[in-house]
C-alpha cells in the first residue's frame, strides 16, 4: 500500500518476514525491493539512505541507535518513526534532532485495550 508509484526498499532481519514481504509485493505487483538485513547490527549507511525521499522505521524495543545515527548523517528529508518503547524513541529522537530534524508530529497509539502499552507514531522533517 505504501509503494504507490514509488520504489520502496524494505529491510528486515527476520527471514520469514522478509520472504513474506517479497511474496506480498510480487502478489500486489508493487516495486518493492526486499532486503534481508539486520539494521540493528548492520544499519544502512548515510549514502544508502540519501537515495530516498523518506524513511519509515519500526525498530524493536531496543530502538534504532545506530540507524538513527546514519539517518541523521544522511540527506533524507522525512522520517516516520514507529516505536513501542518511549525511552529508546526519546534517545533516537534526540539523535535525529541533533542531525537537523524537527519533530513535526507525535501521536500515542493505545492499540491494546487492556494494556498500558503505547505505540508512538512520529514524523520528523528537515526544514
Q: Model regions: which residues?
A:
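Rossmann-like S-adenosyl-L-methionine
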Residues: 1-127
Amino acid at each position: 500500500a505504501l509503494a504507490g508509484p514509488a520504489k520502496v526498499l524494505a529491510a528486515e532481519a527476520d527471514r520469514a518476514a522478509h520472504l513474506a514481504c517479497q511474496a506480498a509485493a510480487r502478489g500486489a505487483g508493487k516495486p518493492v525491493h526486499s532486503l534481508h538485513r539486520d539494521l540493528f547490527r548492520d544499519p544502512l549507511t548515510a549514502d544508502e539512505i540519501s537515495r530516498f525521499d523518506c524513511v519509515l522505521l519500526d525498530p524493536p524495543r531496543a530502538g534504532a541507535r545506530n540507524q538513527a545515527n546514519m539517518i541523521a548523517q544522511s540527506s533524507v528529508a522525512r522520517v516516520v518513526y514507529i516505536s513501542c518503547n518511549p525511552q529508546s524513541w526519546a534517545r533516537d529522537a534526540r539523535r535525529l534532532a541533533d542531525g537537523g530534524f524537527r519533530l513535526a508530529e507525535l501521536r500515542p497509539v493505545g492499540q491494546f485495550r487492556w494494556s498500558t502499552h503505547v505505540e508512538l507514531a512520529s514524523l520528523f522533517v528537515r526544514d
